UniProtKB/Swiss-Prot annotation:
Name this polypeptide is given: Isoleucine--tRNA ligase
Top-level taxonomy: Bacteria, Thermotogati, Thermotogota, Thermotogae, Thermotogales
Enzyme kind, highest EC tier: ligase
Binding site for L-isoleucyl-5'-AMP: 553
Record text on cofactor binding: Binds 1 zinc ion per subunit.
Residue positions binding ATP: 597
Protein localization: Cytoplasm
Alphabetical UniProt keywords: Aminoacyl-tRNA synthetase, ATP-binding, Cytoplasm, Ligase, Metal-binding, Nucleotide-binding, Protein biosynthesis, Zinc
Function: Catalyzes the attachment of isoleucine to tRNA(Ile). As IleRS can inadvertently accommodate and process structurally similar amino acids such as valine, to avoid such errors it has two additional distinct tRNA(Ile)-dependent editing activities. One activity is designated as 'pretransfer' editing and involves the hydrolysis of activated Val-AMP. The other activity is designated 'posttransfer' editing and involves deacylation of mischarged Val-tRNA(Ile).
GO BP term, pick one: isoleucyl-tRNA aminoacylation
Recorded catalytic activity of this chain's protein: tRNA(Ile) + L-isoleucine + ATP = L-isoleucyl-tRNA(Ile) + AMP + diphosphate
GO CC annotations, alphabetized: cytosol
Entry's EC annotation: 6.1.1.5
Principal location listed in the UniProt entry: cytoplasm
Length: 919
């Protein structure tokens, strides 16, 4: 008789081969047809809300691995919260104004842009941005991200621009917005301010000089600075040191020079000066406030300030500060330390009277004269030249300069705004916790916020200038009037309409009372655009109440979106816009290097998706400790395919052995489950509990490790291996088989749900193969989280099994040794003799005597007092070949082989099954 046909072998249509790349597209189409986003929300109608608010990526190119990481993380959170019973809307957004887009458009347009009006350039920018909104939308959807893709928020849309202006109006009304001098890019040949998008970088040969500044207190004590712009020295007012860097005081002749310790060798090598005689080491902060003699004008002084932007890449770690000619110089020198803005250069790039003897000289021509003067004064340490990348004007291709001009600012201290923000920071939950201190220190130290940009592509600042008296006016009434226009026509109206149409009919200059104005053309910093998203989303969407539950972005956003959002929200609404902030690290290559095209180490997420499937990318992310920087390469991604295969095979085995299991008719009550099955069900509860804790703390890599270990070591290598005999050999409807199936069914459903937020495609596929009674919804994404059942955990049983599984490890070692010696082939060829180490273990083995053969997958287990061959911690183990004959059906050895005519060559158990006598 062919006994194989009497076994209950697994049957399933769930394929072994995933074919992810094609299968994922099928599910995407199905989700589209069912209107997945709205369907899932409908299933949570009336449930409590959880709102993760999307930080908008720039619509200036295809998505990269960083944006993919960010969106998948958000998707995991939203899907988990949905399964926990929350109504979790997710509205994606796009940041569509600003430099990155204007820069790309100017590159595409080339020379043509010079003939175009601001309105025409803006139209091109809008087309470019919306094109990439559509591209990125499809790419994000391909990753399996669920969201309201048809109704995103887009910062260039009129209804959003109105909200930007509304938030800005509040700041103006509160008196937080003011106008002041600030250095910006200036082209002396074109005589115009330039936006960053109008800057091109080319190689440029500049002087490279080291200059020593003499202390006012000690004529032999000097700080050595390095600069490539000698022409800015007449505007010098300070010297910046890093507060925490170590600086060496070096004896050179009779003089003492201060140079950053880490740069001493490079300095000596370049200048040929011996710096080996270090007499003292100090921190930058030790010199704060000290006065030094100005290198050009002996009657002026230069004060030491501290700045954390000072680097140890080149120079001396001591930076000459001219707030009139540099952005950092301005922020640290003028805003933080109150140093004066000296900018003795006119619009043609010539020195003014303020520069003394250099008056009338073109700045580049003055470089050589200044170097000679420094040499004559004995303070030029070394001079050479350097070729470096330097900003040039895109119009005339000449080098540009930084020159102080008027700009708009938000005062962060007016109305106690900074203090209010700090108080709100402490009310927010920061994950990881160090995020709180990071953003706190940034807020504590930040200067006033420069919000004006000399760019075309942005939200215009609705300021006007009186033609009669020159007063620049920023008035809430003008902003409000403009907002009404924007609602209908968008912000392009500012660049297209005459000024008379843009201001209220009765509006006059508050200074002179006249009504003759011209438009100012500055635009707002794009961080105000994105920072105002809370106002748009909470006023336009009923399912987004203020404050929002979570913001989730990269850790650079402590300085960016988290920062701008909390300032604007505190100003507008009086509190932080978020309750919880979760941050992730950055993606590096396998060697921990930053990704760059020049290194050739960039991983394109869509390339991964097309080669392996989005599921593998999602699995890679889940495997990563994303709170820190994450490493990726195609090799690292490929490693996940093997993990994926193991997980998939686990589900295939479960589905295959549950094909005939009706969850309503065939379920075995908990109290009737067999011992091993009760243990496995208890273990599942522990897995559910831990997985839930890890998801709640957003530690997805711990979920991944837990599940992978569970699938490979506890299921495949233990429980599922152990119950194969019962599943295949016992009668189809017997308690022995149905007991195992009951627990396997629980494992299947729970494991599917635990993995659904991460493996969104594969768990949908698993769901589609479930018994129809297990499918309550159209999608697994609408299912509820598995319930943790404490009553299913028998603590004594779990403790006993810890010892039994330890003994099992020793048995497996002993079996392997005998396999190597060809004593046995399969483990069922074996009889295992156990020698307990003590009476407690003996009692344990006696208690579970009936399940030991099944647990060890052997034909016989006996206990003995004699010495065993393998010495374990709890037992000694001897393995020998089992006596008797091999059952032709279950392969166990027995001394009672059947001689029945109908069923010859089988063991008593199989004979009973075949006769229908074993239930």
């Amino acid at each position: 008789m062919e006994y194989k046909n009497t076994l209950n072998l697994p049957k399933t249509s769930f394929p072994m081969k995933a074919n992810l790349v094609n299968k994922e597209k099928v599910f995407l189409e199905e989700w589209e047809k069912m209107d997945l986003y709205n369907y899932v929300l409908e299933q949570r109608k009336g449930k409590p809300l959880f709102v993760l608010h999307d930080g908008p990526p720039y619509a200036n190119g295809h998505i990269h691995i960083g944006t993919a990481l960010n969106k998948i993380l958000k998707d995991i959170v939203v899907k988990y919260k949905t399964m926990r019973g929350y109504r979790a809307p997710y509205v994606p957004g796009w940041d569509t104004h600003g430099l990155p887009i204007e820069h790309r458009v100017s590159q595409e347009l080339g020379e043509k842009i010079k003939e175009m009006s601001p309105a025409e350039i803006r139209k091109k920018c809008e087309e470019f941005a919306l094109r990439f909104v559509d591209i990125q939308r499809e790419e994000f959807k391909r990753l399996g991200v669920r969201g309201d893709w048809e109704n995103p928020y887009i910062t260039l849309k009129p209804d959003y621009e109105v909200k930007i202006l509304d938030v800005f109006k509040t700041l103006v009304e509160q008196g937080n917005v003011y106008r002041s001098l600030k250095p910006i890019y200036w082209c002396p040949r074109c005589r115009t301010a330039l936006a960053e998008a109008e800057i091109e970088y080319h190689d440029h040969k500049s002087p490279s000089i080291y200059v020593k500044f003499r202390s006012k207190e000690d004529p032999n004590f000097f700080i050595v600075i390095w600069t490539t712009t000698p022409w800015t020295l007449p505007a010098n007012v300070g010297i910046a040191l890093h507060p925490d860097y170590e600086y060496s005081v070096v004896k050179v002749g009779e003089e003492k020079w201060v140079i950053a310790t880490d740069l001493l060798d490079a300095f000596s090598k370049e200048t040929g000066i011996d710096c080996s005689n270090v007499v003292e080491k100090i921190k930058g902060k030790d010199l704060e406030g000290k006065e030094f003699v100005h290198p050009i004008f002996d009657d002026r002084t230069s004060r030491v300030i501290l700045a954390d932007y000072v680097s140890l890449e080149t120079g001396t770690g001591c930076v000459h500060i001219a707030p009139g000619h540099g952005e950092e110089d301005y922020i640290y020198g003028h805003v933080q330390y109150g140093l004066p803005i000296v900018s003795p250069v006119d619009e043609e790039g010539r020195f003014t009277e303020e520069a003394g003897k250099y008056k009338g000289m073109f700045i580049e021509d003055a470089n050589e004269v200044i170097i000679e003067d420094l040499k004559r004064k004995g303070i030029l340490v070394h001079a050479s030249s350097i070729t470096h990348s330097y900003p040039h004007c895109w119009r005339c291709k000449g080098p540009v300069i930084f020159r102080a001009t008027e700009q708009w600012f938000i005062s962060v201290d007016h109305n106690n705004l900074r203090q209010k923000v700090l108080e709100e920071i402490d009310k927010v939950k920061w994950i990881p916790e160090w995020g709180r201190n990071r953003i706190r220190s940034m807020v504590e130290e930040r200067p006033d916020w420069c919000i004006s940009r000399q760019r075309v592509w942005g939200t215009p600042i609705p300021a006007v200038k009186c033609k009669e008296c020159g007063e620049v006016v920023l008035d809430p009434k003008v902003i409000e009037h403009f907002m009404k226009i924007v609602e209908k026509e968008g912000t392009n109206a500012w660049f297209e309409k005459e000024v008379e149409e843009l201001i209220p009919e009765d509006f006059v200059c508050p200074k002179c009372g006249k009504r003759s104005f011209e438009k100012m053309l500055d635009t707002l910093d794009v961080w105000i655009d994105s920072g105002a998203s809370f106002e748009y989303i909470t006023t336009k969407r009923e399912d987004h109440p203020f404050p929002l539950d979570m913001y989730l972005e990269g850790s650079d956003q402590h300085r960016g979106w988290f920062h701008s959002s909390i300032f604007l929200a505190v100003a507008k609404r009086g509190s932080a816009p978020y309750k919880e902030v979760l941050t992730h690290g950055f993606i590096k290559d396998e060697q921990g290097r930053k990704m760059s095209k020049s290194l050739g180490n960039v991983v394109d997420p869509m390339e991964v998706v097309e080669k392996y499937g989005a599921e593998i990318l999602r699995l890679w992310l889940a495997s990563s400790d994303y709170f820190n920087d994450i490493k990726i390469s195609m090799r690292i991604v490929e490693q996940q395919t093997e993990v994926y295969r193991k997980i998939r095979n686990t589900f295939r085995f479960l589905l295959g052995n549950l094909e005939d299991f009706d969850p309503e008719l065939d379920r075995v009550p908990h109290e009737k489950l067999l011992t091993i099955d009760r243990w496995a069900l208890g273990r599942l509860q522990e897995i559910i509990k831990r997985a839930t804790e890890y998801y709640d703390s957003y530690e997805f890599s711990k979920v991944y490790n837990l599940v992978v270990k569970y699938c490979t070591t506890e299921l495949s290598s233990l429980y599922l291996d152990v119950v194969k005999d019962r599943l295949y050999v016992e009668a189809k409807d017997s308690i022995y088989r149905r007991s195992a199936q009951t627990v396997m069914h629980e494992i299947l459903i729970s494991l599917m749900k635990i993995l659904a937020p991460i493996m969104t495609f594969t768990m949908e596929e698993v769901y589609s193969h479930l018994h129809e009674k297990d499918r309550k919804y159209k999608t697994v994404q609408a299912e509820y989280w598995p319930e943790y059942r404490e009553e299913f955990i028998d603590r004594k049983l779990m403790e006993d099994f810890e010892k039994l599984l330890s003994i099992r490890e020793d048995v497996l070692k002993a079996l392997e040794e005998k396999r190597q010696q060809d004593v046995i082939g399969h483990s069922l060829d074996a009889e295992v003799v156990l020698v307990p180490k003590n009476d407690t273990i003996k009692a344990l083995l006696e208690k579970y005597r009936d399940i030991l053969e099944e647990l060890f997958i052997v034909s016989k287990v006996s206990l003995s007092d004699a010495s065993g061959e393998l010495k374990g911690e709890l037992v000694e183990v001897t393995v020998k070949h089992a006596e008797g004959e091999k059952c032709q059906r279950c392969w166990k050895y027995t001394t009672e082989i059947s001689a029945s005519e109908d069923f010859p060559g089988v063991c008593p158990r199989c004979l009973a099954v075949l006769k229908g006598e074993r239930k």
